[in-house]
Protein backbone atom coordinates (compact mmCIF):
# COMPACT_ATOMS: atom_id res chain seq x y z
CA UNK A 1 0.00 0.00 0.00
CA UNK A 2 2.78 2.43 0.97
CA UNK A 3 4.66 1.55 -2.22
CA UNK A 4 1.55 2.19 -4.33
CA UNK A 5 0.92 5.58 -2.69
CA UNK A 6 4.58 6.60 -3.09
CA UNK A 7 4.55 5.62 -6.73
CA UNK A 8 1.29 7.51 -7.29
CA UNK A 9 2.70 10.58 -5.53
CA UNK A 10 5.72 10.55 -7.82
CA UNK A 11 3.47 10.13 -10.87
CA UNK A 12 1.39 13.17 -9.88
CA UNK A 13 4.44 15.34 -9.13
CA UNK A 14 6.15 14.30 -12.37
CA UNK A 15 3.03 15.06 -14.42
CA UNK A 16 2.64 18.54 -12.92
CA UNK A 17 6.35 19.28 -13.50
CA UNK A 18 6.30 18.11 -17.12
CA UNK A 19 3.44 20.54 -17.77
CA UNK A 20 5.10 23.40 -15.88
CA UNK A 21 2.40 23.69 -13.22
CA UNK A 22 5.16 24.46 -10.69
CA UNK A 23 5.40 27.99 -12.09
CA UNK A 24 2.67 29.05 -9.67
CA UNK A 25 5.06 28.50 -6.71
CA UNK A 26 6.11 32.03 -5.62
CA UNK A 27 9.67 32.94 -4.66
CA UNK A 28 9.03 33.49 -0.94
CA UNK A 29 10.74 32.03 2.17
CA UNK A 30 7.88 29.66 2.97
CA UNK A 31 8.17 27.88 -0.39
CA UNK A 32 11.95 27.40 -0.15
CA UNK A 33 11.63 23.66 0.55
CA UNK A 34 9.16 23.24 -2.32
CA UNK A 35 11.50 25.06 -4.72
CA UNK A 36 14.44 23.01 -3.46
CA UNK A 37 12.46 19.81 -4.03
CA UNK A 38 11.67 21.05 -7.53
CA UNK A 39 15.41 21.28 -8.27
CA UNK A 40 15.82 17.69 -7.09
CA UNK A 41 13.66 16.65 -10.04
CA UNK A 42 15.89 18.55 -12.47
CA UNK A 43 15.34 16.03 -15.28
CA UNK A 44 11.59 16.82 -15.36
CA UNK A 45 11.26 20.01 -17.39
CA UNK A 46 8.26 21.82 -18.82
CA UNK A 47 7.62 20.12 -22.16
CA UNK A 48 4.80 22.46 -23.18
CA UNK A 49 6.25 25.96 -22.85
CA UNK A 50 4.41 27.12 -25.96
CA UNK A 51 1.01 26.54 -24.29
CA UNK A 52 -0.73 28.94 -21.86
CA UNK A 53 -1.09 27.87 -18.24
CA UNK A 54 -4.79 26.96 -18.53
CA UNK A 55 -4.16 24.56 -21.40
CA UNK A 56 -1.24 22.94 -19.56
CA UNK A 57 -3.31 22.47 -16.40
CA UNK A 58 -6.13 20.87 -18.40
CA UNK A 59 -3.74 18.47 -20.15
CA UNK A 60 -2.08 17.54 -16.84
CA UNK A 61 -5.42 16.75 -15.19
CA UNK A 62 -6.50 14.79 -18.26
CA UNK A 63 -3.35 12.67 -18.03
CA UNK A 64 -3.73 12.03 -14.29
CA UNK A 65 -7.04 10.30 -14.85
CA UNK A 66 -10.71 10.28 -13.79
CA UNK A 67 -10.41 11.60 -10.22
CA UNK A 68 -8.43 14.65 -11.33
CA UNK A 69 -10.59 15.17 -14.41
CA UNK A 70 -13.71 15.39 -12.26
CA UNK A 71 -11.90 17.78 -9.91
CA UNK A 72 -11.11 20.02 -12.88
CA UNK A 73 -14.74 19.88 -14.01
CA UNK A 74 -15.88 20.94 -10.55
CA UNK A 75 -13.35 23.78 -10.41
CA UNK A 76 -14.56 24.95 -13.84
CA UNK A 77 -17.89 25.82 -12.24
CA UNK A 78 -16.21 27.98 -9.56
CA UNK A 79 -15.83 31.06 -11.72
CA UNK A 80 -15.88 33.12 -8.55
CA UNK A 81 -12.40 31.74 -7.85
CA UNK A 82 -10.65 31.55 -11.23
CA UNK A 83 -9.92 33.73 -14.22
CA UNK A 84 -12.42 33.14 -17.08
CA UNK A 85 -9.70 31.81 -19.43
CA UNK A 86 -8.65 29.17 -16.89
CA UNK A 87 -12.24 28.18 -16.08
CA UNK A 88 -12.99 27.86 -19.82
CA UNK A 89 -10.07 25.46 -20.25
CA UNK A 90 -11.13 23.32 -17.29
CA UNK A 91 -14.65 23.14 -18.69
CA UNK A 92 -13.24 21.32 -21.73
CA UNK A 93 -12.28 18.30 -19.61
CA UNK A 94 -14.25 15.22 -20.66
CA UNK A 95 -15.26 12.57 -18.14
CA UNK A 96 -15.06 9.65 -20.56
CA UNK A 97 -12.73 6.71 -20.13
CA UNK A 98 -12.37 3.31 -21.74
CA UNK A 99 -14.81 0.74 -20.33
CA UNK A 100 -13.54 -2.13 -18.22
CA UNK A 101 -14.09 -5.72 -19.33
CA UNK A 102 -17.75 -6.68 -19.77
CA UNK A 103 -17.15 -10.14 -18.32
CA UNK A 104 -15.88 -8.51 -15.13
CA UNK A 105 -18.98 -6.28 -15.11
CA UNK A 106 -21.16 -9.38 -15.38
CA UNK A 107 -19.33 -10.98 -12.44
CA UNK A 108 -19.73 -7.87 -10.24
CA UNK A 109 -23.46 -7.62 -11.04
CA UNK A 110 -24.08 -11.31 -10.34
CA UNK A 111 -22.26 -11.06 -7.00
CA UNK A 112 -24.44 -8.09 -6.03
CA UNK A 113 -27.72 -9.71 -7.12
CA UNK A 114 -26.85 -13.14 -5.73
CA UNK A 115 -27.45 -15.24 -8.85
CA UNK A 116 -26.71 -15.44 -12.56
CA UNK A 117 -28.03 -12.66 -14.76
CA UNK A 118 -30.15 -15.15 -16.72
CA UNK A 119 -32.30 -15.57 -13.61
CA UNK A 120 -33.86 -12.18 -14.35
CA UNK A 121 -32.56 -10.85 -17.66
CA UNK A 122 -32.23 -11.73 -21.31
CA UNK A 123 -29.87 -10.18 -23.85
CA UNK A 124 -27.32 -8.76 -21.41
CA UNK A 125 -24.82 -6.85 -23.56
CA UNK A 126 -21.26 -7.18 -22.28
CA UNK A 127 -20.29 -4.23 -24.47
CA UNK A 128 -20.84 -1.13 -22.33
CA UNK A 129 -23.41 1.34 -23.66
CA UNK A 130 -21.49 4.20 -22.01
CA UNK A 131 -18.51 4.52 -19.69
CA UNK A 132 -17.36 7.22 -17.28
CA UNK A 133 -14.85 7.59 -14.47
CA UNK A 134 -17.03 6.17 -11.68
CA UNK A 135 -19.27 3.65 -13.44
CA UNK A 136 -20.41 2.22 -16.75
CA UNK A 137 -23.78 0.98 -18.04
CA UNK A 138 -24.92 -2.16 -19.86
CA UNK A 139 -28.25 -2.98 -21.46
CA UNK A 140 -30.53 -5.98 -20.92
CA UNK A 141 -34.21 -7.02 -20.97
CA UNK A 142 -36.38 -8.46 -18.21
CA UNK A 143 -37.05 -12.10 -19.08
CA UNK A 144 -40.43 -13.84 -19.22
CA UNK A 145 -40.28 -14.83 -15.55
CA UNK A 146 -40.46 -11.19 -14.44
CA UNK A 147 -43.62 -9.07 -13.97
CA UNK A 148 -42.17 -6.52 -16.43
CA UNK A 149 -41.23 -9.13 -19.03
CA UNK A 150 -39.80 -7.55 -22.17
CA UNK A 151 -39.00 -4.21 -20.49
CA UNK A 152 -35.66 -2.85 -21.69
CA UNK A 153 -33.40 -1.86 -18.81
CA UNK A 154 -29.99 -0.39 -18.08
CA UNK A 155 -27.66 -1.85 -15.46
CA UNK A 156 -25.19 0.61 -13.94
CA UNK A 157 -22.13 -0.84 -12.22
CA UNK A 158 -19.37 0.87 -10.22
CA UNK A 159 -15.82 0.37 -11.50
CA UNK A 160 -13.79 -2.19 -9.53
CA UNK A 161 -11.17 -0.75 -7.14
CA UNK A 162 -12.28 2.82 -7.93
CA UNK A 163 -12.91 3.55 -4.22
CA UNK A 164 -9.30 2.76 -3.32
CA UNK A 165 -8.04 4.96 -6.18
CA UNK A 166 -10.29 7.83 -5.13
CA UNK A 167 -9.27 7.70 -1.46
CA UNK A 168 -5.56 7.54 -2.32
CA UNK A 169 -5.78 10.52 -4.70
CA UNK A 170 -7.97 12.50 -2.28
CA UNK A 171 -5.38 12.01 0.47
CA UNK A 172 -2.74 13.52 -1.83
CA UNK A 173 -5.10 16.37 -2.74
CA UNK A 174 -5.46 17.24 0.95
CA UNK A 175 -1.68 17.46 1.28
CA UNK A 176 -1.47 19.81 -1.70
CA UNK A 177 -4.43 21.85 -0.41
CA UNK A 178 -2.60 22.62 2.84
CA UNK A 179 0.21 24.27 0.88
CA UNK A 180 -1.91 26.35 -1.51
CA UNK A 181 -2.91 29.16 0.94
CA UNK A 182 0.77 30.05 1.38
CA UNK A 183 1.30 30.70 -2.33
CA UNK A 184 -0.43 34.10 -2.48
CA UNK A 185 -3.32 36.15 -1.13
CA UNK A 186 -5.43 35.06 -4.09
CA UNK A 187 -4.62 31.44 -3.28
CA UNK A 188 -6.05 31.94 0.22
CA UNK A 189 -9.41 32.88 -1.32
CA UNK A 190 -9.54 29.48 -2.99
CA UNK A 191 -10.02 27.78 0.41
CA UNK A 192 -8.44 24.70 -1.11
CA UNK A 193 -9.10 22.37 1.81
CA UNK A 194 -12.82 23.19 1.68
CA UNK A 195 -12.84 22.57 -2.08
CA UNK A 196 -11.20 19.15 -1.63
CA UNK A 197 -13.59 18.28 1.22
CA UNK A 198 -16.59 19.21 -0.93
CA UNK A 199 -15.17 17.21 -3.83
CA UNK A 200 -14.51 14.19 -1.61
CA UNK A 201 -18.12 14.18 -0.40
CA UNK A 202 -19.40 14.42 -3.97
CA UNK A 203 -17.26 11.51 -5.15
CA UNK A 204 -18.04 9.26 -2.19
CA UNK A 205 -21.76 9.97 -2.62
CA UNK A 206 -21.50 8.94 -6.27
CA UNK A 207 -19.92 5.63 -5.21
CA UNK A 208 -23.14 4.69 -3.39
CA UNK A 209 -25.67 3.94 -6.12
CA UNK A 210 -28.48 3.51 -3.59
CA UNK A 211 -28.28 7.29 -3.13
CA UNK A 212 -28.74 7.79 -6.86
CA UNK A 213 -31.71 5.41 -6.79
CA UNK A 214 -33.35 7.32 -3.91
CA UNK A 215 -32.72 10.68 -5.61
CA UNK A 216 -34.19 9.44 -8.91
CA UNK A 217 -37.30 8.07 -7.20
CA UNK A 218 -37.85 11.37 -5.40
CA UNK A 219 -37.36 13.42 -8.57
CA UNK A 220 -39.64 11.07 -10.53
CA UNK A 221 -42.37 11.47 -7.91
CA UNK A 222 -41.99 15.26 -7.99
CA UNK A 223 -42.59 15.29 -11.76
CA UNK A 224 -45.11 12.48 -12.01
CA UNK A 225 -47.38 13.01 -15.05
CA UNK A 226 -45.44 16.18 -15.91
CA UNK A 227 -45.31 17.35 -19.51
CA UNK A 228 -41.98 19.07 -18.82
CA UNK A 229 -39.72 16.33 -17.41
CA UNK A 230 -39.61 12.54 -17.37
CA UNK A 231 -37.35 10.57 -15.02
CA UNK A 232 -36.79 6.84 -15.77
CA UNK A 233 -38.21 4.30 -13.33
CA UNK A 234 -35.91 2.59 -10.85
CA UNK A 235 -36.26 -1.05 -9.81
CA UNK A 236 -35.33 -1.09 -6.09
CA UNK A 237 -35.40 -4.91 -5.80
CA UNK A 238 -32.33 -4.98 -8.04
CA UNK A 239 -30.50 -2.02 -6.55
CA UNK A 240 -27.39 -2.26 -4.39
CA UNK A 241 -24.51 0.00 -3.40
CA UNK A 242 -22.49 -0.87 -6.51
CA UNK A 243 -25.28 -1.89 -8.93
CA UNK A 244 -28.61 -0.34 -9.91
CA UNK A 245 -31.18 -1.30 -12.53
CA UNK A 246 -33.38 1.30 -14.21
CA UNK A 247 -35.71 1.76 -17.15
CA UNK A 248 -33.93 2.31 -20.46
CA UNK A 249 -34.88 5.54 -22.19
CA UNK A 250 -34.69 6.52 -25.84
CA UNK A 251 -34.19 10.20 -26.47
CA UNK A 252 -32.32 12.78 -28.50
CA UNK A 253 -29.33 14.35 -26.69
CA UNK A 254 -30.23 17.95 -25.90
CA UNK A 255 -26.95 19.07 -27.47
CA UNK A 256 -27.86 17.47 -30.83
CA UNK A 257 -29.48 20.59 -32.25
CA UNK A 258 -29.51 19.27 -35.83
CA UNK A 259 -31.54 16.16 -34.93
CA UNK A 260 -33.90 18.14 -32.71
CA UNK A 261 -34.53 20.61 -35.53
CA UNK A 262 -34.97 17.83 -38.07
CA UNK A 263 -37.50 16.18 -35.74
CA UNK A 264 -39.58 19.38 -35.75
CA UNK A 265 -39.01 20.24 -32.09
CA UNK A 266 -40.52 23.48 -30.79
CA UNK A 267 -37.14 24.92 -29.78
CA UNK A 268 -38.51 28.04 -28.08
CA UNK A 269 -40.81 26.01 -25.84
CA UNK A 270 -38.05 23.47 -25.18
CA UNK A 271 -35.67 26.22 -23.99
CA UNK A 272 -38.34 27.83 -21.80
CA UNK A 273 -39.26 24.50 -20.25
CA UNK A 274 -35.64 23.91 -19.29
CA UNK A 275 -35.73 27.07 -17.18
CA UNK A 276 -39.19 26.20 -15.84
CA UNK A 277 -38.04 22.71 -14.80
CA UNK A 278 -35.12 24.20 -12.91
CA UNK A 279 -37.10 26.86 -11.03
CA UNK A 280 -39.87 24.36 -10.28
CA UNK A 281 -37.32 22.11 -8.61
CA UNK A 282 -35.86 25.02 -6.66
CA UNK A 283 -38.94 26.91 -5.47
CA UNK A 284 -41.62 24.21 -5.40
CA UNK A 285 -39.65 21.13 -4.38
CA UNK A 286 -36.52 22.56 -2.66
CA UNK A 287 -34.71 19.62 -4.32
CA UNK A 288 -32.88 19.87 -7.63
CA UNK A 289 -30.86 17.74 -10.03
CA UNK A 290 -27.40 19.29 -9.71
CA UNK A 291 -25.64 17.55 -12.60
CA UNK A 292 -27.75 18.71 -15.53
CA UNK A 293 -25.03 18.90 -18.16
CA UNK A 294 -25.71 17.92 -21.77
CA UNK A 295 -24.69 14.29 -21.22
CA UNK A 296 -27.48 13.75 -18.69
CA UNK A 297 -30.32 15.50 -20.52
CA UNK A 298 -32.31 14.09 -23.45
CA UNK A 299 -35.47 15.11 -25.30
CA UNK A 300 -38.40 12.78 -25.89
CA UNK A 301 -38.60 12.26 -29.70
CA UNK A 302 -42.39 11.84 -29.51
CA UNK A 303 -44.74 14.87 -29.78
CA UNK A 304 -41.91 17.34 -30.68
CA UNK A 305 -44.40 20.20 -30.80
CA UNK A 306 -44.89 19.69 -27.04
CA UNK A 307 -41.32 18.75 -26.07
CA UNK A 308 -40.46 16.89 -22.88
CA UNK A 309 -37.06 16.56 -21.23
CA UNK A 310 -35.71 13.23 -19.97
CA UNK A 311 -33.27 13.44 -17.04
CA UNK A 312 -30.86 10.70 -15.98
CA UNK A 313 -27.96 10.24 -13.52
CA UNK A 314 -29.28 11.71 -10.27
CA UNK A 315 -26.10 11.02 -8.31
CA UNK A 316 -25.59 14.69 -7.47
CA UNK A 317 -28.54 16.67 -6.11
CA UNK A 318 -28.98 19.86 -4.11
CA UNK A 319 -31.43 20.81 -1.38
CA UNK A 320 -32.51 24.26 -0.22
CA UNK A 321 -34.22 25.56 2.91
CA UNK A 322 -36.60 28.51 3.21
CA UNK A 323 -33.75 30.91 3.95
CA UNK A 324 -31.90 29.83 0.79
CA UNK A 325 -35.00 30.28 -1.37
CA UNK A 326 -35.80 33.68 0.10
CA UNK A 327 -32.23 34.79 -0.54
CA UNK A 328 -32.45 33.69 -4.18
CA UNK A 329 -35.87 35.12 -4.92
CA UNK A 330 -35.39 38.47 -3.18
CA UNK A 331 -31.84 38.89 -4.48
CA UNK A 332 -32.90 38.31 -8.08
CA UNK A 333 -35.91 40.63 -7.79
CA UNK A 334 -33.86 43.31 -6.00
CA UNK A 335 -31.11 42.98 -8.60
CA UNK A 336 -33.46 43.49 -11.54
CA UNK A 337 -34.99 46.44 -9.66
CA UNK A 338 -31.42 47.74 -9.12
CA UNK A 339 -32.11 47.84 -5.39
CA UNK A 340 -28.55 47.08 -4.30
CA UNK A 341 -29.16 48.07 -0.69
CA UNK A 342 -31.77 45.32 -0.43
CA UNK A 343 -29.27 42.88 -1.96
CA UNK A 344 -26.70 43.87 0.68
CA UNK A 345 -29.21 43.57 3.52
CA UNK A 346 -30.27 40.11 2.29
CA UNK A 347 -26.73 38.83 2.76
CA UNK A 348 -26.50 40.27 6.27
CA UNK A 349 -30.00 39.18 7.35
CA UNK A 350 -29.30 35.63 6.18
CA UNK A 351 -26.34 35.49 8.57
CA UNK A 352 -23.86 34.68 5.80
CA UNK A 353 -21.93 37.91 6.24
CA UNK A 354 -21.03 39.46 9.63
CA UNK A 355 -23.72 41.54 11.33
CA UNK A 356 -21.31 44.49 11.67
CA UNK A 357 -20.74 44.71 7.90
CA UNK A 358 -20.73 48.29 6.58
CA UNK A 359 -24.04 48.29 4.67
CA UNK A 360 -23.19 51.42 2.69
CA UNK A 361 -19.87 49.99 1.49
CA UNK A 362 -21.54 46.64 0.77
CA UNK A 363 -24.26 48.34 -1.28
CA UNK A 364 -21.73 50.36 -3.26
CA UNK A 365 -19.67 47.23 -4.01
CA UNK A 366 -22.75 45.50 -5.43
CA UNK A 367 -23.59 48.59 -7.48
CA UNK A 368 -20.08 48.79 -8.94
CA UNK A 369 -20.06 45.15 -10.05
CA UNK A 370 -23.70 44.70 -11.08
CA UNK A 371 -24.59 47.99 -12.74
CA UNK A 372 -22.52 47.32 -15.92
CA UNK A 373 -24.59 44.17 -16.51
CA UNK A 374 -27.56 46.36 -17.41
CA UNK A 375 -25.68 47.60 -20.46
CA UNK A 376 -27.10 44.45 -22.08
CA UNK A 377 -30.76 44.01 -22.98
CA UNK A 378 -32.69 42.46 -20.09
CA UNK A 379 -33.35 39.30 -22.10
CA UNK A 380 -29.62 38.62 -22.45
CA UNK A 381 -28.75 38.83 -18.75
CA UNK A 382 -27.48 35.57 -17.25
CA UNK A 383 -28.93 34.52 -13.88
CA UNK A 384 -25.84 32.39 -13.30
CA UNK A 385 -23.59 35.37 -13.93
CA UNK A 386 -25.70 37.51 -11.60
CA UNK A 387 -25.28 34.94 -8.81
CA UNK A 388 -21.57 34.74 -9.57
CA UNK A 389 -21.22 38.52 -9.24
CA UNK A 390 -23.15 38.48 -5.96
CA UNK A 391 -20.89 35.74 -4.59
CA UNK A 392 -17.73 37.55 -5.70
CA UNK A 393 -18.73 40.75 -3.89
CA UNK A 394 -19.97 38.92 -0.80
CA UNK A 395 -16.71 36.99 -0.48
CA UNK A 396 -14.87 40.32 -0.21
CA UNK A 397 -17.06 41.01 2.84
CA UNK A 398 -16.27 37.63 4.45
CA UNK A 399 -19.32 35.73 3.30
CA UNK A 400 -19.26 32.13 4.48
CA UNK A 401 -19.18 29.55 1.67
CA UNK A 402 -22.68 28.17 1.01
CA UNK A 403 -22.12 24.83 -0.80
CA UNK A 404 -25.79 24.43 -1.71
CA UNK A 405 -25.82 27.82 -3.46
CA UNK A 406 -22.53 27.14 -5.26
CA UNK A 407 -24.08 23.88 -6.52
CA UNK A 408 -27.20 25.75 -7.59
CA UNK A 409 -25.19 28.43 -9.39
CA UNK A 410 -23.27 25.75 -11.30
CA UNK A 411 -26.54 24.05 -12.30
CA UNK A 412 -28.07 27.36 -13.32
CA UNK A 413 -25.13 28.03 -15.64
CA UNK A 414 -25.67 24.59 -17.21
CA UNK A 415 -29.37 25.29 -17.72
CA UNK A 416 -28.79 28.73 -19.21
CA UNK A 417 -26.10 27.42 -21.53
CA UNK A 418 -28.33 24.62 -22.78
CA UNK A 419 -31.33 26.93 -23.09
CA UNK A 420 -29.50 29.49 -25.21
CA UNK A 421 -27.87 26.74 -27.25
CA UNK A 422 -31.33 25.40 -28.07
CA UNK A 423 -32.92 28.85 -28.56
CA UNK A 424 -30.47 31.80 -28.59
CA UNK A 425 -33.25 34.37 -28.14
CA UNK A 426 -34.37 32.84 -24.82
CA UNK A 427 -35.52 35.56 -22.38
CA UNK A 428 -34.50 34.16 -19.03
CA UNK A 429 -36.00 36.95 -16.96
CA UNK A 430 -39.49 36.73 -18.48
CA UNK A 431 -39.41 32.94 -18.16
CA UNK A 432 -38.25 32.91 -14.54
CA UNK A 433 -40.08 35.99 -13.22
CA UNK A 434 -43.47 34.26 -12.67
CA UNK A 435 -41.81 31.60 -10.49
CA UNK A 436 -39.99 34.18 -8.39
CA UNK A 437 -43.02 36.43 -7.99
CA UNK A 438 -45.37 33.55 -7.19
CA UNK A 439 -43.07 32.20 -4.52
CA UNK A 440 -42.57 35.62 -2.92
CA UNK A 441 -46.34 36.22 -2.95
CA UNK A 442 -46.82 32.91 -1.14
CA UNK A 443 -44.42 33.94 1.62
CA UNK A 444 -46.22 37.09 2.75
CA UNK A 445 -49.79 38.15 3.45
CA UNK A 446 -52.87 36.54 4.97
CA UNK A 447 -52.72 33.44 2.75
CA UNK A 448 -49.19 32.70 3.91
CA UNK A 449 -50.29 32.95 7.57
CA UNK A 450 -53.21 30.57 6.95
CA UNK A 451 -50.93 28.14 5.14
CA UNK A 452 -48.42 28.13 7.99
CA UNK A 453 -51.18 27.59 10.56
CA UNK A 454 -52.58 24.72 8.50
CA UNK A 455 -49.16 23.09 8.20
CA UNK A 456 -48.53 23.38 11.94
CA UNK A 457 -52.05 22.38 13.03
CA UNK A 458 -51.11 18.72 13.75
CA UNK A 459 -48.30 19.91 16.01
CA UNK A 460 -50.66 22.32 17.76
CA UNK A 461 -53.18 19.50 18.39
CA UNK A 462 -50.48 17.19 19.72
CA UNK A 463 -49.04 19.82 22.04
CA UNK A 464 -52.49 21.06 23.15
CA UNK A 465 -53.42 17.57 24.40
CA UNK A 466 -50.34 17.65 26.60
CA UNK A 467 -50.97 21.23 27.76
CA UNK A 468 -52.65 20.54 31.20
CA UNK A 469 -49.97 18.05 32.21
CA UNK A 470 -47.26 20.43 30.99
CA UNK A 471 -48.75 23.29 33.05
CA UNK A 472 -48.95 21.10 36.19
CA UNK A 473 -45.35 19.92 35.69
CA UNK A 474 -44.19 23.48 35.14
CA UNK A 475 -45.91 24.67 38.34
CA UNK A 476 -44.41 21.79 40.32
CA UNK A 477 -40.98 22.55 38.92
CA UNK A 478 -41.42 26.24 39.75
CA UNK A 479 -42.50 25.35 43.29
CA UNK A 480 -39.45 23.13 43.70
CA UNK A 481 -37.21 25.85 42.24
CA UNK A 482 -38.67 28.47 44.61
CA UNK A 483 -38.08 26.15 47.58
CA UNK A 484 -34.49 25.51 46.51
CA UNK A 485 -33.93 29.24 46.01
CA UNK A 486 -35.26 29.95 49.51
CA UNK A 487 -32.96 27.30 50.98
CA UNK A 488 -30.08 28.73 49.02
CA UNK A 489 -30.83 32.25 50.28
CA UNK A 490 -30.88 30.98 53.88
CA UNK A 491 -27.56 29.23 53.37
CA UNK A 492 -26.01 32.30 51.80
CA UNK A 493 -27.36 34.56 54.58
CA UNK A 494 -26.04 32.18 57.22
CA UNK A 495 -22.63 32.15 55.54
CA UNK A 496 -22.67 35.95 55.41
CA UNK A 497 -23.60 36.19 59.13
CA UNK A 498 -20.86 33.74 60.06
CA UNK A 499 -18.37 35.70 58.02
CA UNK A 500 -19.37 38.95 59.81
CA UNK A 501 -19.21 37.27 63.23
CA UNK A 502 -15.80 35.77 62.47
CA UNK A 503 -14.46 39.20 61.54
CA UNK A 504 -15.85 40.67 64.77
CA UNK A 505 -14.38 37.87 66.84
CA UNK A 506 -10.99 38.36 65.24
CA UNK A 507 -11.15 42.04 66.17
CA UNK A 508 -12.33 41.24 69.71
CA UNK A 509 -9.67 38.59 70.09
CA UNK A 510 -7.04 41.08 69.08
CA UNK A 511 -8.35 43.58 71.62
CA UNK A 512 -8.45 40.94 74.40
CA UNK A 513 -4.92 39.85 73.67
CA UNK A 514 -3.68 43.40 73.73
CA UNK A 515 -5.56 44.06 76.98
CA UNK A 516 -4.28 40.91 78.63
CA UNK A 517 -0.80 41.88 77.55
CA UNK A 518 -1.15 45.22 79.30
CA UNK A 519 -3.72 44.18 81.97
CA UNK A 520 -1.41 44.72 84.94
CA UNK A 521 -0.61 48.25 83.81
CA UNK A 522 -4.28 49.31 83.42
CA UNK A 523 -6.06 51.04 86.33
CA UNK A 524 -8.73 48.93 88.05
CA UNK A 525 -11.55 51.35 87.22
CA UNK A 526 -10.84 50.80 83.45
CA UNK A 527 -9.98 47.05 83.44
CA UNK A 528 -13.20 45.82 85.05
CA UNK A 529 -15.70 47.59 82.66
CA UNK A 530 -13.79 46.40 79.58
CA UNK A 531 -13.75 42.76 80.73
CA UNK A 532 -17.45 42.98 81.59
CA UNK A 533 -18.36 44.29 78.09
CA UNK A 534 -16.35 41.55 76.34
CA UNK A 535 -18.01 38.84 78.43
CA UNK A 536 -21.47 40.22 77.65
CA UNK A 537 -20.67 40.28 73.91
CA UNK A 538 -19.59 36.64 73.98
CA UNK A 539 -22.64 35.59 75.99
CA UNK A 540 -24.96 37.43 73.57
CA UNK A 541 -23.47 35.60 70.57
CA UNK A 542 -23.90 32.26 72.29
Swiss-Prot record:
UniProt: ATP binding residues: 129-137, 156
Top class in the EC scheme: transferase
Keywords annotated in UniProt: ATP-binding, Cell inner membrane, Cell membrane, Kinase, Membrane, Nucleotide-binding, Transferase, Transmembrane, Transmembrane helix, Ubiquinone biosynthesis
Superkingdom of origin: Bacteria
Membrane topology summary: Single-pass membrane protein
Annotated ranges, domain Protein kinase: 123-505
Predominant cellular place of this UniProt entry's protein: membrane
SUPFAM superfamilies reported in the protein's UniProt record: Protein kinase-like (PK-like) (SSF56112)
GO biological process: regulation of ubiquinone biosynthetic process; ubiquinone biosynthetic process
UniProt xrefs under InterPro entries: ABC1_dom, Kinase-like_dom_sf, UbiB, UbiB_bact, UbiB_kinase
Family: Belongs to the ABC1 family. UbiB subfamily.
Name this protein carries in UniProt: Probable protein kinase UbiB
Organism: Haemophilus ducreyi (strain 35000HP / ATCC 700724)
Underlying gene: ubiB
Amino acid sequence: MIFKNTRRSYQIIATFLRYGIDEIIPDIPFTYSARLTRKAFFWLQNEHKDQPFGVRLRLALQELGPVWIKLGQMLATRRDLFEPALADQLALLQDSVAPFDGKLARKIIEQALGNTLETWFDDFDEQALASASIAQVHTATFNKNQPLAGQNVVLKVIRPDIEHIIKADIALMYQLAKLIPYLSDDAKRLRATEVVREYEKTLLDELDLTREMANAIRLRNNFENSEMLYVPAMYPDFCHKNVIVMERIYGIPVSDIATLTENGTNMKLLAERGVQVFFTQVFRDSFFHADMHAGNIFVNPNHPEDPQYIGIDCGIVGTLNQNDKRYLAESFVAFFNRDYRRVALMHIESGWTPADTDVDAFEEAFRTVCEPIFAKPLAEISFGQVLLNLFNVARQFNMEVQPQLVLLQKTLLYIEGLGRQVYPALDLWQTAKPFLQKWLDQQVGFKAILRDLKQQAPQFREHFAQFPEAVFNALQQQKHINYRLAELNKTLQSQADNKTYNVKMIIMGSIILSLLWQFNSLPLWLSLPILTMLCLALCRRK
